[in-house]
């Protein structure tokens, strides 16, 4: 389509290359100079007068003014994978810088030698294995230490009482560290006394278990507390000849529990330990309980001939109340034993066979508790007790004696007894005051000779190192695992159908289990007084008494008459442990 448009006083001819002719307007796309006067093959005449109304904003485009092409989009220089890797790397670097500068701190500078020399000897610490000998010749890491120096030595200040109190934030520094008349003085602590409610609960549970076990084993002829007391009271080596057989008629283990309170830790002077030793003092009170023992016997007149006259005697002794102050302290292992807290010398010419025989003889006594004193040497003519045999076995087995717990009562204790007596056969005398005084004085002397200061009782602490031989499972899975042989510890539970016997299963390095019949009689063990060694050599409880220390008696109907005679021979050993009468056997679960 050609037309002439006056522009700035000149005539120019334009041609519309593209035109779209709707009913009321013309859409112009672009202009270019041309001489053609056709639009889509048809002649078209353009009216110049209509141009301003149709194209109010149209501007002429000359030949030298063409439309510029649109700018091309800039392509990224990195691909998507490269950008992802760069982003991940930057995040890792940021996290690493945060951990290094905000979480980890700088290494502390090495301690200066001037600071070490300025410290006193009591506060100087060892920073290496050879700190004493390597102050001027430090050892490099490439040097291999000797075998004896692998375990770091314990500083001498670690066992000091002041160091222990300082590290545990306990104020028990003695106000007057002097002694009087060569005896150690008890210094009061500035720390507030502590209540022992949690300790009372633990002690009550322990005593309740002892009472329950003693009642469970009441029908056993060998392991019951009745049999143990009868054997102890009728010991021919200690019972006088003018006393007939003593028969126990009544035993009551009580129903109440002792209450401990007002616990305080004090520092006590001890010339044999550096810095003294620590001692825990606690008040104990037991009242309104029913601890009683009743016996019957006869006094024999053996002159001018044996059994010339017989006088029946019945006694009943009850503990009405006991109160006192209990002292507890720990005794280091290398310098002590279960018999004395000082070194005990034995005759050099004493043979092993004689010692073993005396140990076996004294083991049968069982109930006699020897006197324990501080730094008291054992006489050369005294025979070792069962505790000494046990300690000797422990010393040979583990190399050094174990650490012990020493406990005693202060002299200001209170022990109230009630003694009832009945003397005579036909015309009886009841509750004779003189008899009550004699019995009460004898009981007081017996108690003071054993557990009243300065005499103490020393008990070896058990080994609490975790072992598979002592591993058990709580709940109802015990019996299932014992049958399947999964556990390696005797899992002992009481008999079900009215049975008082025990059953178990040995495993690992244990010494086998015990399984009793429905009545608890005929067991192949000596119950509460003597028990085979728990660490037998292969006693896995296969058949009766096979293996060292292993005893196994099936509780089935076909094996109810199998006693401990079949297994007592190989199961009994010379190092059997002595147990308190009425105490629980190993691993007895009461339901």
Swiss-Prot record:
Where does this protein have compositionally biased stretches of type Basic and acidic residues? 563-578
Q: Where is this region: Disordered?
A: 138-159, 170-189, 334-398, 479-591
Keywords in alphabetical order: Endoplasmic reticulum, Lipid transport, Lipid-binding, Membrane, Transmembrane, Transmembrane helix, Transport
State whether keyword Cell membrane applies. no
Stretches assigned to the SMP-LTD domain? 192-462
Give one GO term, molecular function aspect: lipid binding
Sequence ranges of Low complexity compositional bias? 379-389
Please classify the protein's predominant subcellular localization into one broad category.
endoplasmic reticulum
GO cellular component term, pick one: ERMES complex
Gly residues bias located where?
496-525, 536-550
* Membrane topology designation: Single-pass type I membrane protein
- Where does the record place Polar residues bias? 146-159, 170-179, 336-371
Disulfide partners = none
Q: Which residues lie on this side of the membrane: Lumenal?
A: 1-83
Residue ranges spanning the membrane: these are 84-104
Concerning PANTHER family, the annotation shows: SMP-LTD DOMAIN-CONTAINING PROTEIN, TEX2 PROTEIN-RELATED
Function of the protein: Component of the ERMES/MDM complex, which serves as a molecular tether to connect the endoplasmic reticulum (ER) and mitochondria. Components of this complex are involved in the control of mitochondrial shape and protein biogenesis, and function in nonvesicular lipid trafficking between the ER and mitochondria. The MDM12-MMM1 subcomplex functions in the major beta-barrel assembly pathway that is responsible for biogenesis of all outer membrane beta-barrel proteins, and acts in a late step after the SAM complex.
Q: What binding partners and quaternary form does the record give?
A: Homodimer. Component of the ER-mitochondria encounter structure (ERMES) or MDM complex, composed of MMM1, MDM10, MDM12 and MDM34. A MMM1 homodimer associates with one molecule of MDM12 on each side in a pairwise head-to-tail manner, and the SMP-LTD domains of MMM1 and MDM12 generate a continuous hydrophobic tunnel for phospholipid trafficking.
Q: What is this protein called?
A: Maintenance of mitochondrial morphology protein 1
UniProt organism field: Ajellomyces capsulatus (strain G186AR / H82 / ATCC MYA-2454 / RMSCC 2432)
Q: Which gene encodes it?
A: MMM1
